[in-house]
């Protein structure tokens, strides 16, 4: 993961690696902090695909980018799968790029982005979390989605968010969705434990970053 600076405000960080938490939220580490911050290499949950390097061997093991994850959370999905298989994602602060945030959708909050990101958030959970992990996180997930619904309702995008959630459930239980679901394996049980601890810890990190 590179240190991504905001195209229009290069003195501010746009992302220093990505995190994902038990609320079902993905967020950019270090967003809006000064460029000088986050200067140490460290492990992160995933890399923003806007500027990242991936080993070919990892894709050969976990599978490629999922075309069903078009536009949003596709990099979190790759990072999640990598974690399941025991790989680690690292932040490299010496790699600096300028990033035009929301370049595909045109703005931070709009119907296109809200619809796709909410859809993909459901699909992400379905694909990567075993049933037991979903149940373990269910109270946090319900809270996280309730907060998002209220947030987008205030912005006049509540209906679009709910519509996207419906699309996410339909995608998850469609033939294409089931085809891409990560199959649970006991040999990865320890990795799931590590992931779960990260999901809980990242809820607190969300308050800081």
Question: Whereabouts are the PLM-identified features?
Answer:
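Short, flexible, basic/aromatic active-site loop/helix in glycosyltransferases
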Residues: 20-44, 60
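Non-catalytic, C-terminal membrane-associated alpha-helical segments of glycosyltransferases
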Residues: 134-209
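A short, conserved alpha-helix in the catalytic core of glycosyltransferases
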Residues: 45-96
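Conserved donor NDP-sugar-binding/catalytic core segment of glycosyltransferases
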Residues: 1-26
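Nucleotide-sugar-dependent glycosyltransferase catalytic core
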Residues: 98-119, 150-160
């Amino acid at each position: 993961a590179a240190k991504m600076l905001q195209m229009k405000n290069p003195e501010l960080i746009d992302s220093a690696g990505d995190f994902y938490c038990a609320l079902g939220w993905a967020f950019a580490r270090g967003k809006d902090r000064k460029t000088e911050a986050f200067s140490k290499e460290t492990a992160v949950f995933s890399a923003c695909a806007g500027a990242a390097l991936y080993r070919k061997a990892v894709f050969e093991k976990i599978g490629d980018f999922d075309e069903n994850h078009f536009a949003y959370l596709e990099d979190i999905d790759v990072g999640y799968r990598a974690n399941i298989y025991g790989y680690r994602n690292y932040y490299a602060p010496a790699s600096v790029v300028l990033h035009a945030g929301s370049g595909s959708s045109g703005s931070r909050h709009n119907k296109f982005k809200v619809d796709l990101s909410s859809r993909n958030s459901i699909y992400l959970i379905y694909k990567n979390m075993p049933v037991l992990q979903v149940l373990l996180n269910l109270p946090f997930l319900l809270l996280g989605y309730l907060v998002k619904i209220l947030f987008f309702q205030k912005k006049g995008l509540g209906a679009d968010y709910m519509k996207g959630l419906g699309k996410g459930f339909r995608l998850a239980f469609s033939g294409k969705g089931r085809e891409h679901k990560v199959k649970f394996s006991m040999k990865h049980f320890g990795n799931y434990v590590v992931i779960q601890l990260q999901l809980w810890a990242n809820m607190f990190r969300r308050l800081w970053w």
